[in-house]
Amino acid sequence: MSSQTQRQPDHGVVRQYSVFVENKVGRLSELVESLAKADVHILALCMVDSTDSVIIRIVVDHPEQAETVLNEHKFANDAMGVVALELPSEAHLQNVADILLRAEINIHYLYPFLFRPSGRCGLVLRADDQDLAAAVLARHGVTVLGQSDLAR
């Protein structure tokens, strides 16, 4: 989306699920299989482990269906908003970091998309304030994606 156009209602913040599982063999496979059977595609993924548990952060193409699957399969989860970005190349990460620094917005974490149909780099970003981060980045010409941009 061009920074010259008005933001669509869903642009700026997309839904991320943090899925909490035991740190044991096969749990990621179970999660991916459960979602795939419901025709839900994982578009971005990040795993953070500790001794006994793992937090699997995912952004999917159909969050409502994903939430149903997660709950039906008893995957403990928490939904929250994150900012999804599309960048011309990996070199533009510096630009994103600089824009948010100048706006005094802290980046809590970020991780890449697994796949973007346009062939561009994609990032998921969690900041102090998702709406403000999305607005500031869009104002500086960064392509901010909405949930409808992620649907297949």
Where are these regions (language model features)?
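Structural preference for solvent-exposed beta-strand-turn elements
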Residues: 1-70, 77-90, 95-97, 101-152
